[in-house]
Amino acid sequence: MKKTIFILGLLGLTIFGGLYAKRKFYDPKHRLENARTEVKKLADKEEIKNGDLIFQTSLSGQSKAIQLATKSKYSHCGLIYKDGNDFYVFEAVQPVKRTPLDKWIARGQDGKYVIKRLKNADQVLTPTTLTKMKQVGDQFKGKNYDLTFEWSDDKIYCSELIWKIYQRATGIEIGKLEKLSDFDLTNEAVKQKMKERYGDKIPTNEIVISPVAIFDSELLTTIKSN
């Protein structure tokens, strides 16, 4: 009898735990509520500033391939701006746009993120420079997401967007530029995604900048991660 009660109790806890985890991590409404609480804490503690960079593991269809090819769990990134009392992420999705920070966080895997900042941000990111960064960004607003990761301004992808904004507004290059051939293209998931995008003509000499190249830059310091 005791054994039966124990098993039933354990089963109940397992079901409850599963339902709680599903609500916490998979229910869109609850994910957004959590993200709003997180953003409020960040704002109240003044932990984020204009020009900060934010990284996450995206839930997009290409995220896994990016992670495997670049050997990093971070597959998406954006640039944080404050407008009035609200924070936004300027990002390259479809199309390039600004997204409320809470919605951006809620969209990522488990609501996890890392915020980074230039080590000398106080000297570099003056009001004039931030205005220039926004002006550079406005040139990309509304452009299509670049599925083939070409180094042109016709279309744009996430890490390319923030790299070019910083470089053109401040002269600072955050992250080492690489070629497509520098990545690990051997995994089957990566091969399949490359086949979808390029067919048999993979542009291995194409210049690229990955989220992890920016993430690992020695010019940045970590401000917050959850």
Question: For each of these PLM feature ranges, what is it?
Answer:
Residues 2-226:
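Cysteine-nucleophile amide-bond enzymes
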